[in-house]
Curated annotation (Swiss-Prot):
Changing residue 172 to A: Loss of kinase activity. No effect on dimerization. Loss of USP38-mediated degradation. Autophosphorylation at Ser-172 activates the kinase, and is an essential step for virus-triggered signaling. Phosphorylated by IKBKB/IKKB at Ser-172. Phosphorylation requires homodimerization and ubiquitination at Lys-30 and Lys-401. Dephosphorylated at Ser-172 by PPM1B and this negatively regulates its role in mediating antiviral response. The keyword Ubl conjugation applies. Changing residue 607 to A/R: Attenuated homodimerization during Sendai virus infection; decreased interaction with IRF3 or MAVS; decreased IFNB1 promoter activation. It is found in: Cytoplasm. Changing residue 38 to A: Loss of kinase activity. It is an enzyme of class 2 (transferase). The active site is at 135 (proton acceptor). The lineage of its organism: Eukaryota, Metazoa, Chordata, Craniata, Vertebrata. This is Serine/threonine-protein kinase TBK1. Changing residue 448 to R: Decreases phosphorylation and kinase activity. Abolishes dimerization. It comes from Homo sapiens. GO terms for cellular component: cytoplasm; cytosol; intracellular membrane-bounded organelle; nucleoplasm; serine/threonine protein kinase complex.
Length: 729
């Protein structure tokens, strides 16, 4: 045990080891509070005194929630050497987190965003104080749990740090080689002398490598044999990186370098975040310091990402989930554009559904006023045009080979890899289940909306039939009036046109039968047992009640226990006979559990999901055809209504002229009577006939006026009840 005046620690209770110091877990003598005690070794004292004091001076200047706090500088009781009393971080480092099998293919998106936020926050504080860290890596980013239960990451280990302004440079070498800037790598690792000086932006390269590692679980630049076994190829990769690339991997010995500007498919970050993050990585992973972004642009771009809100969207036809990263002050117009970038559905074809109802976003509506969404409760987007069904895109990863040879180091590495694959399969199984549940929900809601559209079309068709019937009766009565006018030799040029309109109205009336038949066909397809019913969605695929994810998790828990035991075995370096036999049995169990898990994943999760995907594609194709048919019928009803309205308007104009024509008819009879003296009987008959004709015409005009009044009242009553938004079909 060692101690200072206020703290003590056991030499066996070590937290970490570095080139110049060890860190122990210690306690305050009076309170018992835990602290991290940094004790410098003999190598550290070989450094110049000013270099030894530099870490103390740097830490004294820093005070930020994302920097490990320095509480005191004390002296060890026996040696009188300086020790640092620092904040204790019980959850280890980011490296510890990335070593977990569950993070073998990168952190979950929510955790990655916390890393991004905290590292950027810590680095910004360093820059404000004119300090360059020079050894940014996952092992130097500590983790604690905050009061809200979320992770908080803090920069630590400022042994390599020094004060340096943006326009200053340095020539000394520090850092960990996988995370080193290419210019520093050349001198520090390859031992090649050059006259280059390094600026503060060398930290940006290390940050880029760290962020890529956190996002994917792997280093971005990897020779076939590994970064430390083939340093020349490693240097070739990091100096030869094309502009825009964020990774370079050699997949075969002496093989070519595979460059990529995108994250690997196995990465758990959403596409919405990746499109924002990859340009940042591409521009800070830049060997040429002239082309590399400066800190100002780096902070501006990362701040832009961190200040965005997320709107969850699910594309029903494509069966894909999306996260739309958008500023709270952005409008619905920008939201539709961002949806297009991820789904390729143009804005005019995007129909939105939220919690079973159509969601209409006014163009100027701000994103902060959108409905609240989650992965389980997103906004559904449906395209009015055909789309290819895509589904979840994931990497099909096979189990690594298990070598029968007994090897503690190799077995620990193998256990980590094989457990990581099953963790990945478990995550994919959970996502596949979520996608199927969202499809079931979306299909159910869409069917209800189509039924609403169908009912509105039926309602509109009923309106049209009533209007058409009134119009036909009106035109028939108008024809009778004009025919009577013709009987007294009064010219009625409109009669031919009226008869033509009557014929057209009868033709329109006969077309109602075809529309009715089509509507009945649609109704039968939407009814239970019809081709568009959703019964299949509850029969196909996987369901929560199957508990497939839970079954995989049970096997994964067994594997994880074996993995942790293998880590302990590796630390022991050598096992007694009995422990060695247990180790060998566990190795067999590990492979058995892994094989069983992957078989279950393939047979029960993947195959059933693919069957569901195929059925979904077939249903969506039928649904789109039905909606187009329904839209066509609706448009036919509106077209008929418009045509009938035009004929009715013309008829009304004719009716307005009838009183004048009747007056003309009465006058014309008087003037056209022959001057001879007819018999008294003839005069009486003519007078009675004219009186009767006049009464009939007046009766027809009155009836026509009443019909028009009824039509007007009917129109006003149904105006609010008709289809308002036909484009929604």
């Amino acid at each position: 045990m060692q101690s200072t005046s206020n703290h003590l620690w056991l030499l066996s209770d070590i937290l970490g080891q570095g080139a110049t110091a060890n860190v122990f877990r210690g306690r305050h003598k009076k309170t018992g509070d835990l602290f991290a005690i940094k004790v410098f070794n003999n190598i550290s004292f070989l450094r110049p005194v000013d270099v030894q004091m530099r870490e103390f001076e740097v830490l004294k200047k820093l005070n930020h929630k994302n920097i490990v706090k320095l509480f005191a500088i004390e002296e060890e009781t026996t040696t009188r050497h300086k020790v640092l009393i620092m904040e204790f971080c019980p959850c280890g480092s980011l490296y510890t987190v990335l070593e977990e099998p569950s993070n073998a293919y990168g952190l979950p998106e929510s955790e990655f965003l916390i890393v991004l936020r905290d590292v950027v926050g810590g680095m910004n504080h360093l820059r404000e104080n004119g300090i360059v860290h020079r050894d940014i890596k996952p092992g130097n980013i500590m983790r604690v749990i905050g009061e809200d239960g979320q992770s908080v990451y803090k920069l630590t280990d400022f042994g390599a740090a020094r004060e340096l302004e943006d326009d200053e440079q340095f020539v000394s070498l520090y850092g960990t080689e996988e995370y080193l800037h290419p210019d520093m790598y050349e001198r520090a690792v390859l031992r090649k002398d050059h006259q280059k000086k390094y600026g503060a932006t060398v930290d940006l390269w290390s940050i880029g490598v760290t962020f890529y590692h956190a996002a994917t679980g792997s280093l971005p630049f990897r020779p076939f044999e590994g970064p430390r076994r083939n340093k020349e190829v490693m240097y070739k990769i990091i100096t030869g990186k094309p502009s825009g690339a964020i990774s370079g991997v050699q997949k075969a010995e002496n093989g070519p370098i595979d460059w990529s500007g995108d994250m690997p498919v196995s990465c758990s970050l959403s596409r919405g975040l990746q499109v924002l993050l990859t340009p940042v990585l591409a521009n800070i992973l830049e060997a040429d310091q002239e082309k590399c972004w400066g800190f100002d642009q780096f902070f501006a771009e990362t701040s832009d990402i961190l200040h965005r809100m997320v709107i969850h969207v699910f594309s029903l036809q494509q069966m894909t989930a999306h996260k739309i990263y958008i500023h709270s002050y952005n409008t619905a117009t920008i939201f539709h554009e961002l949806v297009y970038k991820q789904t390729k559905i143009i804005s005019s074809n995007q129909e939105l559904i939220y919690e079973g109802r159509r969601l209409v976003l006014e163009p100027g509506r701000l994103a902060q006023h959108f409905p609240k969404t989650t992965e389980e409760n997103p906004i559904f987007v449906v395209s009015r045009e055909p789309l290819n069904t895509i589904g979840l895109i994931y990497e099909k990863i096979s189990l690594p080979k298990v070598h029968p040879r007994y090897d503690l180091d190799g077995d620990a590495s193998m256990a980590k890899a094989i457990t990581g694959v099953v963790c990945y399969a478990c995550r994919i199984a959970s996502t596949l289940l979520l996608y199927q549940e969202l499809m079931r929900k979306g299909i159910r809601w869409l069917i209800e909306l189509i039924k609403d559209d169908y009912n509105e079309t039926v309602h509109k068709k009923t309106e049209v039939v009533i209007t058409l019937d009134f119009c036909i009766r009106n035109i028939e009565k108008t024809v009778k009036v004009y025919e009577k006018l013709m009987k007294i030799n009064l010219e009625a040029a409109e009669l031919g046109e009226i008869s033509d309109i009557h014929t057209k109205l009868l033709r329109l009336s006969s077309s109602q039968g075809t529309i009715e038949t089509s509507l009945q066909d649609i109704d039968s397809r939407l009814s239970p047992g019809g081709s568009l019913a959703d019964a299949w969605a509850h029969q196909e695929g996987t369901h929560p009640k199957d508990r497939n994810v839970e079954k995989l998790q049970v096997l994964l828990n067994c594997m994880t226990e074996i993995y942790y035991q293998f880590k302990k075995d590796k630390a022991e370096r050598r096992l007694a006979y009995n422990e060695e036999q247990i180790h060998k049995f566990d190795k067999q169990k590990l492979y058995y559990h892994a094989t069983k898990a992957m078989t279950h994943f393939t047979d029960e999760c993947v195959k059933k999901y693919e069957a569901f995907l195929n059925k979904s594609e077939e249903w969506i194709r039928k649904m789109l055809h039905l909606r187009k048919q329904l839209l066509s019928l609706t448009n036919q009803c509106f077209d008929i209504e418009e045509e009938v309205s035009k004929y009715q308007e013309y008829t009304n104009e004719l009716q307005e002229t009838l009183p004048q024509k009747m007056f003309t008819a009465s006058s014309g009879i008087k003037h056209t009577m022959t001057p001879i003296y007819p018999s008294s009987n003839t005069l009486v008959e003519m007078t009675l006939g004219m009186k009767k004709l006049k009464e009939e015409m007046e009766g027809v005009v009155k009836e026509l006026a009443e019909n028009n009044h009824i039509l007007e009242r009917f129109g006003s009553l149904t105006m609010d009840g008709g289809l308002r938004n036909v484009d929604c079909l």
